[in-house]
UniProtKB/Swiss-Prot annotation:
Gene3D superfamilies: Ribosomal protein L6, alpha-beta domain. This protein binds to the 23S rRNA, and is important in its secondary structure. It is located near the subunit interface in the base of the L7/L12 stalk, and near the tRNA binding site of the peptidyltransferase center. One of its GO terms (molecular function) is rRNA binding. Part of the 50S ribosomal subunit. The lineage of its organism: Bacteria, Bacillati, Bacillota, Clostridia, Eubacteriales. GO terms for cellular component: cytosolic large ribosomal subunit. This is Large ribosomal subunit protein uL6. It holds the Pfam family Ribosomal_L6. Belongs to the universal ribosomal protein uL6 family.
Length: 180
């Protein structure tokens, strides 16, 4: 049995989980509502303040889906209850971020500013011009938007300049020594 899959997902107060016969899981909470279609090879049941995920057989693909389905449901419950935040830091001379309405404008050393529209379900917050917070209830979407922002200037190993996650550690390299 899957170590992750056999644990029930606790449903906190204020959160409701419904499962349709074709395995569409809908989670409603104080921050919003998420719905996701799960595989029909997995059985999902809501039993007194918890969601229990089980499987019928032990085929390799079904075993893999067991833990995945439980983790996805857990992420949905956490998202509608608390939400998710990814913080990015801009490191470099002249690297700045600012908000124009719902649009994030980044100055990253290009000849033009980089503009990113907020996808529905995600909002941006800028702290001090060098920290960008990506907030939302869908963990996958928050991570994808944060990765798209980071993609514009990945941190380089010599000076550490670029866009990095808040807790990310950049492996540094020594530069050339040169002749003397």
């Amino acid at each position: 049995m899957s170590r992750v899959g056999k644990l029930p997902v606790a449903i906190p107060n204020g959160v409701t989980v419904t499962v349709t016969p074709d395995n569409v899981v809908t989670v409603k909470g104080p921050k919003g509502e998420l719905a996701k279609a799960m595989s029909n090879k997995i059985n999902i049941a809501v039993e007194d303040n918890s969601v229990v995920v089980t499987r019928d057989n032990d085929h390799k693909d079904v075993r893999a889906l067991h833990g995945l389905t439980r983790a996805l449901i857990n992420n949905m419950v956490t998202g509608v209850n608390e939400g998710y935040v990814k913080t990015l830091e801009l490191v470099g001379v002249g690297y700045r971020a600012q908000l124009q309405g719902k649009k994030l404008v980044l100055s990253l050393g290009f000849s033009h500013p980089v503009e990113m529209e907020a996808v529905s379900g995600v909002e941006f917050e800028v702290e001090g011009g060098t920290k960008v917070k990506v907030k939302g209830i869908d963990k996958e979407l928050v991570g994808a938007v944060a990765a798209d922002i980071r993609k514009w200037r990945k941190p380089e190993p010599y000076k550490g300049k670029g866009i990095k996650y808040e807790n990310e550690v950049i492996r540094r390299k020594e530069g050339k020594t040169g002749k003397k």
